[in-house]
Amino acid sequence: MEWRGLVQNISSPELIDKLNKGGMTFYIGTDPTADSMHIGHYSSFLISKRLAKAGHHPILLVGGATGLIGDPKPSSERPLISKEEVEKNIKGLTAQAKKIFGFDVVNNWDWTKDINICDFLRDYGKYFNINYMLAKDHVKSRMDVGITYA
């Protein structure tokens, strides 16, 4: 795929060796913005299915917590979705992902729901590199047009 120009960057060149060995567990993430899969899911789900056939183990991470915060689009803000709507969407996505792709599914709400903001900032904030985040194109574009973080 790299020689075809389909790879923009590789976060870790060692990853290629790991992919060739098989047996790696990885996740793909999606926010529950709808109760059904759509074409936007297709490419990452298809690649995950192919990796599963090559001996890897995909896990679908559904963003029950991140879906409540917002969707990081570079040029517009998404209206907030109610907790009830997010829960309904998670049920639909989970059922489809298990049936069609056989994925294990986890929800980030399960391990974030009990963390308060002070604990989060104290325990995890130190791992966020502001320069790294500000260098990202999607963050820059949101700042340029004055869109909030969510």
What are these regions (language model features)?
Residues 2-150:
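NTP-dependent nucleotidyl-transfer catalytic core
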